[in-house]
Structure formats: C-alpha cells, structure tokens
C-alpha cells in the first residue's frame, strides 16, 4: 500500500512547471507546493512516532508551531525531504513487530488510538487523499488553459 501510494504521488508530481507548482484555483485554495510542504511536515511526524514513539502533533499533542513555521515553502527541498522521511518510515515499518506497532500507535494517537495499528496505515491514507487533490489541481490548471486533463481514469464506469 505504501509503495503504491508513493509511486502514484511521484507520478502526480512529474513534469510540473513553476507556475503550476504555485497555482491556486482560488486565492484561498491550496497550491501544490503548499500540499507538498504539509506532507513533508506530517511525514516527519509519522516517522518520529514510529521510530521513537512520540505523540502525533495535531492529534495527541499541540502542533509545534515554531517548528512548522521554520519549514520554508521550497517545493524541491520539501519533496526531497518528504521522500527521505517517507522511505525511512516504510523501511522501519517493514521491520516493526505488531506488538511494537501497537505500542507506537498508542503513544502516537493517545485517546484517538482506537484503531490498534493506525500508525501503520494512517500516513498512506493521508498521502493518497492529497495525491487525489494534486491530480485535481493539475486537471483544473490544464482545463483553465484549454488543455486536456492529465489524469483521466481508464475505467469503463466513467463516461468518455
């Protein structure tokens, strides 16, 4: 699941122009660079929760605003750091026992840890949601310029 989500995200981020990276469909909407920054921050939090057993910010503890503010809006650097954190997370997850995963999930999510192994899949689900958001932004960007969408389902249940 993690490998599939990562490959889909990488595919969704291929061949981006600088304009497309920063484009917003509305002034209050997220741009792709903002989403990648968000994913980078959260990937580090997931890694820290799995690797050293710390509580998950925004869920079990308050978000460290000073640390968040220190992460610049630099698409290339954030994508690089996201990949490093995500890859490390998956490597550690592969080597983690179910008992340790259960313990780290409880530490990460506190009272929200009703799902015993949530730490093992939460990041992939979160990233998949934002991957869909990025694809939608890219399709809207192209549509606004009279170009065909780049992400069209190849599935007979969708009309042509």
What residue ranges belong to the model's regions?
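Short, contiguous alpha-helical
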Residues: 2-10, 18-65, 107-160
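Short, solvent-exposed, charged loop/turn and helix-capping segments
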Residues: 16-19, 94
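Acidic/histidine-rich alpha-helical segments that form the ligand environment
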Residues: 67-107, 115-128
């Amino acid at each position: 699941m993690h490998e599939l989500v990562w490959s889909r995200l990488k595919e969704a981020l291929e061949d981006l122009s600088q304009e497309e990276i920063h484009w917003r469909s509305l002034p209050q909407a997220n741009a792709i660079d903002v989403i990648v920054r968000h994913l980078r921050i959260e990937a580090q939090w997931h890694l820290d929760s799995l690797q050293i057993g710390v509580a998950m910010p925004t869920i079990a503890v308050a978000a460290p605003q000073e640390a968040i503010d220190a992460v610049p809006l630099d698409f290339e650097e954030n994508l690089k750091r996201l990949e490093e954190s995500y890859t490390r997370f998956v490597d550690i997850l592969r080597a983690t026992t179910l008992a340790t995963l259960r313990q780290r999930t409880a530490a990460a999510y506190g009272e929200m840890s009703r799902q015993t192994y949530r730490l093992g899949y939460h990041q992939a689900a979160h990233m998949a949601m934002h991957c869909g958001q990025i694809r939608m932004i890219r399709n809207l960007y192209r549509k606004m310029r009279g170009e065909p969408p780049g992400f069209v389902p190849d599935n007979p249940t969708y009309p042509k």
